[in-house]
Amino acid sequence: MKIAFTVYNLAFVSNWIERLMPYWENCEIVIFHIANLQGQKEPAIEGVKSYDVSSRSYSEIIDIIEHERIDLWINFNFRSLFELFFQRICALQNIKSVYLEHGFFSQNTLHFKTQKAQKNIWETVNRQLNFWKKYIGVLYHAKKRLQEWRILQQVYFKNNFKYSPFDYYFIFSQREYSLLSNVFPLDESNTSLIGYPIFSSEKDKKEATSAGLKMNGEVLYVHQPFILDGYATISYEEEKKYFLDLEKQLLKKYKRLIVLLHPRENLSTYIKRFADTQIDIIQSPNNYSCFTDKSLIIGHYSTALLYALYFEKPTIILNYPSVKNDPIFQECFPTVEDMENICTIDFQIDINKKIPFAGKENTYEHIA
């Protein structure tokens, strides 16, 4: 079987594709990405065929797809014109399409990141023009042009995603099923609840469970790229002050603060920025061991907080300067409005939310 992936950001390669590959037998992997358009370095992955379609036309992309003879196409997202472009090609070329959930559904999922677009206006304009040039090919070459135009209007401009459904949906949990049922026509025949992947394999899962959990006195802060994505109006230096103020409060009770940096942020830049502090900056996507020995987890609405929920770690939702928290995890974790109260609150979590939110199985092996 030949499986293709739409890769908007190369972080999906290391965070998902490379984690799934060991469990696929007799499968060829092809990725279609826009590294050049995104200013990223093109990946070189053993066993994976890679196509940068940044500067390729609709006709050139179709030629590649027909040459590769794709059996199954996987999308991690469904909101951008880039992803809709490949989804419509699948529908027109009779290629089975799959939506593989990579992050929790939130109030931001169905909306464009307008703050980020305004912050990087010319990059955004260039990227959107690139997508539109490609998509015009879909409209022009389709046998039912009027129908394709109506689908574009409904999906892209009106958020009516049911006009362009996937063939299959792999989503984390019952919570996600309930929400995404309002977006896509989900039912038992086309949807699988796969569980959020905490572990690589069943073996890792058993080893972690048998090892037990520890409390080492350290605090793990799960970072979100609020500044990078344009959600926050503060500067990186102001963010540094925010972390230093947080550390000052935490040291009244805990040993040290560790910041788990978001995968899309630049690790070396952050390490240099915090070189004159005692705050540790790490970047270790999909590594459950970052959570198992911590005494407290702090976050906002990152999907990575599912690790904390899975391991039943004391966890709080903390306000971030100039950003309104998404209410995703308010059902699971307490919210602290003022960081001065961070060491005085009893951090009780609702473990009954574990399966409804994180699902079952929870391995890449199971998803594959």
Regions found by a protein language model. Give the residues of each.
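Donor nucleotide-activated moiety binding/catalytic core segment of transferases
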Residues: 53-65, 260-311
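Catalytic donor nucleotide-activated moiety binding site of glycosyltransferases and closely related
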Residues: 33-45, 222, 244-284, 326, ...
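Conserved catalytic-core segment of nucleotide-activated headgroup transferases in glycan assembly
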Residues: 16, 196-269
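Catalytic binding pocket for nucleotide-activated donors in carbohydrate/polymer assembly enzymes
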Residues: 303-361
